[in-house]
Amino acid sequence: MKVTLIAILTCAAVLVLHTTAAEELEESQLMEVGMPDTELAAVDEERLFECSVSCEIEKEGNKDCKKKKCKGGWKCKFNICVKV
């Protein structure tokens, strides 16, 4: 009986710690209002460039354009990366 109680309490403690860590991570990833988004713009431009160059290279090789999968919630569409 003691072992079961200890196991339940341990699981509850782990769940609480995991939830707290997830909330802290989410809060750290949120942007503050009024914060300049120059870093985001640079990432957007980089993905746009990578995606369009990848498709152009494949087109010049007389192959169908197999669109490169963009990462981080982006998708290659019409030779540009678009947010999904």
Curated annotation (Swiss-Prot):
One GO location term (cellular component)? host cell postsynaptic membrane
Tissue and organ distribution? Expressed by the venom gland.
Keyword terms:
Disulfide bond, Neurotoxin, Postsynaptic neurotoxin, Secreted, Signal, Toxin
Q: List the disulfide bonds.
A: C51-C65, C55-C76, C70-C81
Where found in the cell?
Secreted
Principal place where this protein is found?
secreted
Supply one GO molecular-function term: toxin activity
Mind telling me which SUPFAM superfamilies this protein's record contains?
Answer: omega toxin-like
| InterPro entries linked to this entry | Hwtx-2-like
Q: Name one Pfam family in it.
A: Toxin_20
Propeptide residue ranges? 23-47
What range does the record give for the signal peptide?
Answer: 1-22
What does the sequence similarity comment in the record state about its family?
Belongs to the neurotoxin 12 (Hwtx-2) family. 02 (Hwtx-2) subfamily.
Q: What does this protein do?
A: Postsynaptic neurotoxin.
The name this protein goes by in its record: U4-theraphotoxin-Hhn1ac
* Species this protein is from: Cyriopagopus hainanus
Highest classification ranks of the organism: Eukaryota, Metazoa, Ecdysozoa, Arthropoda, Chelicerata
